[in-house]
Structure formats: structure tokens, C-alpha cells
Amino acid sequence: MKQMSHLDDIPSTPGKFKPYFHRTRWQSSVAKLAFWSLVFVGLIFIFFYRSPVSSNPADPSRRSLRTYSWGGPAWEKRVRSSARLRTRRGFSVLVTGAAGFVGTHVSAALKRRGDGVLGLDNFNDYYDPSLKRARQALLERSGVFVVEGDINDAALLKKLFEVVPFTHVMHLAAQAGVRYAMENPSSYVHSNIAGFVNLLEVCKSANPQPAIVWASSSSVYGLNTKVPFSEKDRTDQPASLYAATKKAGEEIAHTYNHIYGLSLTGLRFFTVYGPWGRPDMAYFFFTRDILKGKAISIFEGVNHGTVARDFTYIDDIVKGCLGALDTAEKSTGSGGKKRGAAQLRVFNLGNTSPVPVTDLVTILERLLKVKAKRNIMKLPRNGDVQFTHANISSAQRELGYKPTTDLQTGLKKFARWYLGYYNGGKKAAS
């Protein structure tokens, strides 16, 4: 007797059922309904219940959207005060991810030059939340109020735009990290795609619509082998989920620009480093492990090829961000209706000087006066690429972008900050 396969349920001739196919159309509809219901429930589970939970419920850095506290006269007063301009021609800027590495530096720079700045950050625990709190305290002393909330909270975003008619948004909030995407993929979709769409939805309905500058990533170049990387190069071969979400962000930006007249500028950052940096970046955890006497893993490419990065110092990145804000044209819509064509741009922000990771380690050894224990390993197939190299001609021409800090100088500044922050300045970098 012939064994029945799941393929045998399909009619060999359209409209003609096989003898053993007895399910009614009603039963089939119920089955389909049940299937899609399960899919829907599964998606809800992934995006709302799979996000990391704290082992300490009282830890404010791990709060969910439902527990953020905002609103009220006192809160609104702080929001207005922080966003108030100090110069006649200044901007009123909402900075998302303000307690992050780049967000902190950009917020401080904007405030120093007289712009009104309001920060927004959810203080998640992707890396040590206490570092984010320290950055927050730094900004508070500069007069920047950082609202604790999430970009997926539409009600909060709408309230912020009701209180302050922002002229610009600097969108730096994102789930960062290439390798972490293999452990928690849903967080990348939640922050980098859903969060971005939520922000754009609020911005397109605002009156006036703000001009938006946002952080894309050099990772969008993925498996591209042409160097240096140009904005005109292909970006359809992402090597990681993180890269894929950033590429998706660029396509989403194009859509909102085309339909709603939002002015959007994407910035592809190349390996940003410096004081107050991210602990998940190689230069940061290399420094930590070298000082502790732990071995560090240094990757090499195929056939012992060199792994190199276009390391870009934070002050240079900040100049590029401010240049993008200063040259951003106004959005052309209002209340969700497009009035005309709007500006849409994307720029590389790099240093144009790729440096082998082995050279970075050598510089750190000299600055820290400690010999590193090197463990050479093959580059894992988890999203990392062998090299990055930025072509910055477009940013130079249109933003006046000109990086001035070499890796030796930048790492010296980072090492001094690191030793002061973590070691009380016991070992000074020289």
C-alpha cells in the first residue's frame, strides 16, 4: 500500500480532489485561521515577552515600556527648559539614545553651542547601565534633561512633540552590536526597525515636521569587496542581522521621505571610539583585559589575512553629525501631508585610514605600559567582516567633514579617560 505524503493532499488537477482528501472547505478555513492565529500570537510573544528581564526587578535600567514614568507640570517644565534655545538661530533638537556613546557627545556639543537639546533614552542593559547613568549625570550638569523612555512608546513621543515643536531630531537610539544579534535577534527588529518606524510616524504627523538625521552604519556594506566603501556601492549583501536592520532603516527612510516629505539624512558611522565609549567595542574590552592580565582574542582573516578597521574618533563623528544637522533642509510636509520633494541623503563618516587590529593592540600596550597576552583566532562567521574603509568625499563636500584625529592620539585620550574612570587615574597613559 502506498504511504501517504503531505504532498498527496494537493490535487493533481485544479478543482479535482483525490479520493482520500475528505476535509471540507469549512475545516480548511478553520485550520488556516488557527495557523495564522498561532503565528500572530508567536510574534506578540517574541516582541513583547522575549525581551531581556532583570534579575533585580528594582533595577530602573531594565524597566519595560509600561513602567516608565513621565508627564505632569514639573516634568513638562524640565522638558521645555532643556529644549529652550540660547541663541537666536539655534535649533531645538530631540536626541534619541542620548545616554549612549555618540548621543552623549552630540548632545553636549549641541548644548555648548547654544541649541536647545532634549534627550531620550531607555537605559537598557545591553552593556553596563551605570555607565549610561554616569553619562546622563554629565549631561544633566550641562543642562540637558534626558527623558527616560522608549522610542516604541508612541504616546510619549507625541507628548514630547506637543510640549516642544522640535526643529530637528538626531536619532541615535538603536540596538547595537554585530555578534549579540545571534543571541537576541528580536531586540534588533524591535529597536532598529519598529522603533524607527514609530519615531517616523510621530515625526510625519508633527506640525511642523522636523528634519531628521539618523545613525545608519558602515555595516550596510556587508560583503562588499570594493574599497574604499562609497555611498554608491552596493549594500544588498548584509553580513549580519544588525547590518540588515540598518539597511532596512535606509529603505524605510526613503519611503517616509517619498510619501510624507520628511527630510532625512543617514550617517554611516565607521568604528567609533573614544572617551565614554561602549564596553562591547574591541578597543574598550582589550583595554580592560590587558590591564587585568587576561588574554585577548585577535582575529585574522582567510589565509592569515589582516583584519583592519577604519577607526574614527568620537570628536570627528560629532563634527559630522553637527554638519549634517546644519545642512539639513526643512521637511516639506505637515500633519502627515507632503507639500513637495524633500531632502534625502546618506553619508559615510569615517577616518579614511584603516588600521590593522594588531596595530591597535600595540598602541594600547604602549599607552597602558602592559604587554598583552595575544590569542590569534580565525575570524568567526558571525557577522564580522575583515576590513572597513570609508570614502568620505561626499561628506567632505557637502558637510565640511574633515577628520583630524589619528588612532594614536585618539587612543591616548581614551586611555586617560578609562584609567581615570575605572582606576582612579592610578596609571596615566603617556
Curated annotation (Swiss-Prot):
Family membership noted in the UniProt record: Belongs to the NAD(P)-dependent epimerase/dehydratase family.
Role played: Involved in the synthesis of the negatively charged monosaccharide that forms the backbone of pectic cell wall components.
Record keywords, A-Z: Carbohydrate metabolism, Golgi apparatus, Isomerase, Membrane, NAD, Transmembrane, Transmembrane helix
Gene: GAE3
Chief location category: Golgi
InterPro entries noted in UniProt: Epimerase_deHydtase, NAD(P)-bd_dom_sf
The protein's Enzyme Commission number: 5.1.3.6
Protein topology in the membrane: Multi-pass membrane protein
Domain of life of the source: Eukaryota
Binding residues for NAD(+): 92-123
Reaction(s) catalysed by this chain's protein: UDP-alpha-D-glucuronate = UDP-alpha-D-galacturonate
Segments passing through the bilayer: 29-49, 90-110
GO CC aspect terms: Golgi cisterna membrane; membrane
Tissue: In roots, leaves, siliques, flowers, pollen and stems.
Any one GO molecular function term: UDP-glucuronate 4-epimerase activity
Protein location: Golgi apparatus, Golgi stack membrane
Known partners and oligomeric status: Homodimer.
UniProt name for this protein: UDP-glucuronate 4-epimerase 3
Residue positions of the active site: Y242 (proton acceptor)
SUPFAM superfamilies registered for this protein in UniProt: NAD(P)-binding Rossmann-fold domains
